[in-house]
A protein has these predicted regions:
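Bacterial Sec-dependent N-terminal signal peptides
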Residues: 1-38, 46-51
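Acidic glycine-/aspartate-rich tracts in secreted/extracellular proteins
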Residues: 23-24, 124-127, 160-165, 204-208, ...
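Catalytic histidine site
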Residues: 80, 85-139
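Conserved catalytic-core segment of clan PA serine endopeptidases
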Residues: 56-65, 120, 127-191
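C-terminal subregion of chymotrypsin/trypsin-like serine protease catalytic domains
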Residues: 53-84, 111, 115, 119, ...
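Extracellular, surface-exposed repeat architectures
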Residues: 351-424
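Acidic Gly/Asp/Thr-rich repetitive segments characteristic of extracellular carbohydrate-active
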Residues: 317-348
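Chymotrypsin/trypsin-fold serine protease catalytic domain
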Residues: 154-258
Length: 424
């Protein structure tokens, strides 16, 4: 009997595949078990690149920008009172905050996982499909299959599978508070009774260095980190309000072309955790100093897309029989629904009980979601040798799912959630 936490099963290899070591928040429980001058940052030809500088290595070492983004060295998630040696031998102290976990950033930095099969980026990344339509977490590539965008350059994406390599960034930042409340909740004491909101960004973009002569290169999987302080919570720019920030003067990593969509994080003092403020939209600057603009996370649009992929199924400790495109519980039968794009939805089970498959079930981009603190059994009706294929399985905290179904030969079972999956 297998107990799986966040892992995937490959029918091709006939075994469990461990998630990447980059997945800092994932554990496994198994025995086998602004103006016209505002520039969006989509990748363009090198002849049109505005900013030749990225990492300022006149004071800090290049490795520190890279190590922070990849949570290596002294930058382990949760580490506090972190210091680095500058080139002149003096110490640079980072803010008195725990180091963020950046595993929610896709390998090229252009999008951020927010859990399940969802990720966020900026809408204008659609012009460059390689930047956000295909996302790699750990060693697994995911594909965008649906999205919603806003006029404020926000984009929420549905991916083809549940992302197992990370739990995703927390999206509880409350942009609807007034400015003072936001500063009080997310600010850091910088002395003289003053608070500033300090945060981090992780992206790729055109990698260059100030202080030395190098050619420019766009290396999509070369992630580096920025340290910044917010200067304007409601900068009125093209499309709507953006958050404006400036880079730290010592640990300076300017935003460049290719950084569009990269995640921006601030610390929630009330909940004692890092949260996603939004995604990188654009820049204004002269090559030495710059202001970066961030599109705030849009919970309303995110929930609208999620609703397109939800079909609620209340079993209530009974048996749900699935076959012929229908779900039958007692004397009640409902169709397995699809959204307006003819895509299968997630079947969201509640109440505990048994799920019996009469035939092979291919949910396409939909998966199984189980509520908290319940017991479920998934098996074939009779002795049928049936298979399951879909986006994955999401098991709520405190729930246990006994799974006695084979996997389709061309699929991998992605399991997420804090509950237990027992593969029989």
């Amino acid at each position: 009997m297998n107990k799986i936490y966040s892992i995937k099963y490959s029918a091709a290899t006939g075994g469990l595949i461990a998630v990447s070591e980059l997945a800092k928040k994932v554990t496994c429980k198994t025995n086998r078990k602004i103006s016209a001058a505002l520039l969006s940052l989509a990748v363009i030809s090198y002849t049109n690149i505005i900013y030749a500088a990225n990492m300022d290595i006149s004071k800090a070492w290049a490795r520190d920008y890279l190590d922070l983004a990849q949570n290596k060295g002294v930058f382990q998630p949760g580490s506090t009172h972190v210091k680095i040696k500058l080139k002149d031998g003096t110490d640079f102290s980072f803010p008195a905050l725990p180091v963020p976990d950046f595993s929610s950033a896709t390998a090229n930095g252009a999008a951020t996982s927010i859990g399940g099969a969802y990720a966020v980026t900026v809408a204008h990344n659609a012009k460059n499909k390689s930047s956000a339509n295909y996302q790699t977490y750990g060693s697994t590539q995911y594909t965008q299959i649906n999205r919603m965008t806003t006029g404020n350059d926000f984009s929420i994406q549905r991916l083809n599978k549940y992302v197992v390599e990370t739990r995703g960034a927390d999206t509880s930042f409350n942009y609807n508070e007034n400015n003072q409340n936001i500063i009080d909740r997310y600010g850091v004491d910088v002395g003289n009774g003053k608070k500033e909101i300090i945060g981090f960004r992780v992206g790729s973009g055109n990698t260059t260095f100030s202080g030395i002569k190098t050619s420019q290169t766009y290396q999509a999987d070369l992630l580096s980190a920025s340290l910044f302080h917010i200067t304007n919570l409601r900068a009125n720019t093209v499309g709507g309000n953006k958050v404006e920030y400036e880079n730290d003067s010592y640990f300076t990593n300017l935003t460049t072309n290719g950084d569009s969509g990269s995640g921006v994080y601030v610390f929630d003092n009330k909940e004692d955790k890092w949260v996603l403020l939004g995604t990188t939209h654009g820049i204004i600057g002269n090559g030495k100093t710059q202001k970066t603009y961030v599109t705030p996370f849009d919970s309303k649009t995110t929930n609208e897309l999620k609703q397109l992929f939800i079909q609620n199924v209340n079993i209530d400790n009974n048996t749900a029989t699935i076959g012929g495109g229908k779900i039958t519980i007692g004397n009640t039968t409902q169709d397995i629904e699809k959204n307006k794009n003819d895509q299968n939805k997630d079947l969201v089970f509640s109440g505990g009980g048994k799920i019996s498959l009469k035939e092979n079930l291919d949910l396409g981009y939909g998966g199984f979601i189980f509520d908290k603190n319940k017991k479920y059994t998934v098996s074939a009706e009779g002795n049928n040798n049936v298979t399951f294929k879909g986006a994955g399985i999401d098991i709520g905290k405190g729930s246990t799912v006994d799974w006695n179904i084979k996997y389709a030969s061309n699929d991998a079972l992605h399991k997420i959630g804090e509950g237990s999956l027992n593969v029989i």
